[in-house]
A protein has these predicted regions:
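Short acidic active-site motifs
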Residues: 85-90, 117-118
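Short helix-capping segments at alpha-helix termini
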Residues: 68-74
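Short, glycine-/small-residue-rich phosphate/pyrophosphate-handling segment
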Residues: 130, 135-162
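Glycine-rich, Arg-bearing micro-motifs that act as flexible, cationic patches
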Residues: 102-125, 139-142
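Small/aliphatic-rich secondary-structure junction motif
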Residues: 2-52, 77, 152-162
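An anion/phosphate-binding loop that grips the pyrophosphate of nucleotide cofactors and donors
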Residues: 97, 126
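Short, surface-exposed alpha-helical segments at coil->helix boundaries
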Residues: 54-65
Length: 162
C-alpha cells in the first residue's frame, strides 16, 4: 500500500505556537480536506519533561487550533503531545503520512535559508512530502486577507517539497 492511502490517510503538522506554525496548521487542515485525510497535530516536548509540561502542551494545542481556525476545523483531527527532539519526532510521526507540514523562518540563526535544524532534518529524513510555511511576519497583508475571510495559509513560494 502506498503511504497515505487507505482508510488511515493522514496529514501531520508540527506546531509550537509561533505564527509560522499556526500558518502550517491552517495549511495542513486545508490539505487534509483536499486529500480526504485525517489531520494529526503534534506538539513536541523534551523527553524528560514533567506532566505539567505535557498539560501545557495540550493547552497550547487547543490554543493553536482556536487561533488557526476560529470556527473550528472541518476535519477530524488528533492532537498529540509527543516527547523527544522536535525534528526526529516529527519525522517519526509522519511515517506513512501523505504530507508533513512545518513552520519555519526564511532566515534562521543557523544560516539555513529555510529555517533552523528542524526544517533541515525533516527535509533530509522525512520519507514523504514536506511542506514548509515560512516567515509569516513578511506576510502581514495575507493575515489581513484571512481576517477578512479569504483563504490561504502560506504563500506558494514558502513551500518546500522533497
Amino acid at each position: 500500500m502506498q503511504p497515505g492511502t487507505g482508510p488511515r490517510r493522514r496529514v501531520v503538522v508540527g506546531v509550537d505556537g509561533t505564527p509560522n506554525s499556526l500558518a502550517a496548521l491552517r495549511r495542513a487542515a486545508d490539505q487534509a480536506g483536499q486529500r480526504d485525510a485525517r489531520l494529526e497535530i503534534v506538539y513536541v516536548i523534551p523527553a524528560g519533561a514533567n506532566g505539567a509540561a505535557e498539560a501545557s502542551g495540550y493547552e497550547m494545542l487547543n490554543m493553536a487550533v482556536r487561533h488557526a481556525s476560529p470556527r473550528g476545523l472541518d476535519r477530524p483531527a488528533d492532537s498529540l503531545v509527543a516527547r523527544g527532539k522536535a525534528a526526529e519526532t516529527l519525522v517519526q510521526r509522519s511515517a506513512g503520512a501523505e504530507l508533513l507540514v512545518i513552520g519555519a523562518r526564511i532566515h534562521s540563526g543557523y544560516g539555513n535559508l529555510l529555517g533552523g535544524d528542524v526544517v533541515s532534518y525533516c527535509l533530509s529524513h522525512a520519507r514523504g512530502t514536506v511542506d514548509i510555511c515560512a516567515d509569516q511576519r513578511a506576510h502581514a497583508a495575507q493575515a489581513a486577507a484571512q481576517a477578512a475571510g479569504r483563504s490561504g495559509a502560506c504563500p506558494p513560494r514558502s513551500q518546500g517539497v522533497k
